[in-house]
């Protein structure tokens, strides 16, 4: 007999937010805010001037495909059972289809020019298969149906962070949200792919932390869930790991394909995340939602300029060429 789904889970599933009306509303996102905090001028080129540049890579293709495979597995597992998911889903085939499909999509977006080669494509594919195989074998460490329900994958958030700017809406999609009936708590999980996992520097990167902090804040506001009943976690999938018998291994965790990290999310941290969004909105938007016509400063550095899609175009920005 199927478990009775808790009413709070049904309520969230059945009440998605109203879609953005782009005729008069503007959407912002974590990625937009992150770009602005790195370099306001880059944000202006992309979002005000609408000068789009191809930014995908084998890393983004890989990440999208792994996300899709993981989310499909969890959808089936929680809808039926983990045994059924293990039996009925060929993870390698599903991942391969998603991987090839996403590459083809981005290939077309790149004016039908390749941005990877066969050797690199094969390496990343084999890494993905290894991650998914390891996850299936160790799944019970991370996900269970005992008193736990899947609220959804790619759960949408659409909300106005600043009520003085009602036409500026924050939009995001939560990778995985679960609900534990025993403790009456929700967990928001953000899946990340990484070469070797996150080091201490990455974990302490406040800009990275803001993504989940804002998801927690806005999930709470959108569905009326107390903040203290919401947990957050980065679920980091590693492409490269040491063998458990490797002489250089310092900890068994170095052989794990999964790394979990829950950033602090108390009042102070949430306050800093809210301030970052409000500062972004105040700097960039008018009260009616229009983008301000102003000078957006350039903040050149080796890090920001190296990853900037406009770095070769001096007519758009010459500030970073000393760092190239």
State the predicted function of each range.
Residues 1-28, 160-161:
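Long, acidic, intrinsically disordered low-complexity segments
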Residues 80-85, 162-167, 180-185, 223-226, ...:
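Short, solvent-exposed loop/turn segments that connect beta-strands within catalytic domains
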């Amino acid at each position: 007999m199927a478990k009775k789904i808790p009413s709070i889970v049904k309520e969230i599933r059945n009440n998605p937010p109203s879609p953005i009306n782009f005729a008069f509303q503007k959407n912002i996102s974590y990625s937009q805010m992150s770009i602005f905090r790195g370099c306001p001028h880059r944000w202006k080129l992309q979002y005000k001037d609408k000068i789009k540049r191809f930014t995908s890579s084998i890393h983004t293709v890989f990440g999208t495909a792994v996300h899709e495979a993981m989310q499909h597995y969890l959808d089936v597992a929680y809808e039926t059972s983990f045994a059924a998911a293990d039996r009925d889903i060929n993870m390698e085939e599903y991942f391969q289809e998603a991987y090839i499909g996403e590459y083809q999509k981005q290939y077309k977006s790149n004016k039908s020019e390749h941005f990877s080669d066969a050797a690199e494509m094969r390496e990343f594919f084999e890494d993905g298969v290894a991650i998914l195989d390891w996850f299936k074998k160790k799944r019970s460490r991370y996900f269970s149906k005992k008193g736990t329900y899947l609220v959804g994958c790619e759960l949408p958030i659409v909300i106005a962070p600043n009520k003085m700017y009602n036409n500026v809406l924050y939009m995001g999609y939560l990778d995985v949200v679960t609900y534990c009936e025993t403790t009456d708590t929700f967990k928001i999980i953000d899946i990340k792919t990484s070469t070797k996992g996150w080091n201490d520097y990455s974990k302490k990167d406040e800009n990275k932390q803001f993504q989940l902090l804002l998801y927690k804040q806005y999930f709470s506001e959108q569905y009326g869930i107390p903040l203290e009943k919401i947990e957050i976690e980065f679920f980091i999938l590693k492409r490269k790991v040491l063998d458990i018998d490797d002489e250089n291994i310092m900890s068994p965790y170095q052989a794990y394909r999964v790394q979990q990290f829950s950033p602090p999310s108390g009042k102070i941290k949430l306050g800093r995340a809210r301030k970052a969004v409000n500062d972004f909105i105040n700097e960039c938007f008018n009260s009616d939602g229009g983008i301000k016509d102003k000078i957006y400063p350039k903040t050149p550095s080796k890090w920001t300029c190296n990853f900037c899609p406009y770095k070769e175009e001096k007519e758009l920005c010459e500030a970073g060429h000393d760092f190239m």
